[in-house]
């Protein structure tokens, strides 16, 4: 908001004036999905999508938004994941007037790491959650046209305490 650390005030000055200084840079290195078809066009990392949307909302020129690549308007959107970043993506896609928004998550609602409030808000906004599902491969010629999805069953809890996802044999379906 028109403030740059080091230019408008030094980090030392901020520390002197405040009880705490929180630096929230977030995670900017996407996790790669290593499945067949992950090299197809129109598959984007979450932060690229969210950053483009935020910049556009601030009035910036964003080439990949302006050319339609990162604009969800009138598109069928699938978001993979169950954390707060995934919830930000599904809700942003809804606000951009996507035709449909689905969220694939490999566990059930009770074992999801994201905020339950965010999930409830996304559901109220029309996001369809496809619980107990995991992408198997992306299908298409040059760009993604469908996603082949495996159904999941939950096993025993893992180190995190959440039940471990196990792929159900011969259960795949397409979205």
Labelled PLM ranges:
Residues 1-32, 54-67, 95-175:
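A Rossmann-like FAD-binding core segment of flavoenzymes
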Residues 2, 30-96:
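Glycine-rich dinucleotide-binding loop and its adjacent helix/turn
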């Amino acid at each position: 908001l028109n403030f740059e650390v080091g230019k408008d005030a030094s980090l030392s000055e901020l520390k002197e004036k405040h009880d705490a200084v929180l630096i929230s840079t977030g995670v900017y290195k996407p996790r790669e999905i290593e499945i067949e078809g992950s090299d197809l066009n129109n598959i984007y990392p979450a932060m690229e999508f969210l950053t483009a949307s935020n910049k556009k909302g601030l009035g910036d020129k964003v080439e990949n938004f302006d050319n339609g690549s990162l604009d969800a308007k009138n598109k069928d959107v699938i978001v993979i994941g169950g954390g707060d970043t995934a919830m930000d993506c599904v809700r942003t896609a809804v606000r951009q007037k996507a035709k449909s928004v689905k969220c694939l998550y490999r566990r059930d609602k009770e074992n999801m790491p994201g905020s339950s409030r965010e999930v409830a808000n996304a559901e109220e906004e029309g996001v369809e959650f496809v619980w107990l599902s995991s992408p198997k491969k992306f299908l298409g010629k040059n760009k993604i046209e469908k996603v082949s999805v495996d159904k999941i069953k939950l096993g025993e809890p893992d180190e995190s305490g959440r039940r471990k996802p196990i792929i159900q044999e011969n259960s795949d379906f397409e979205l």
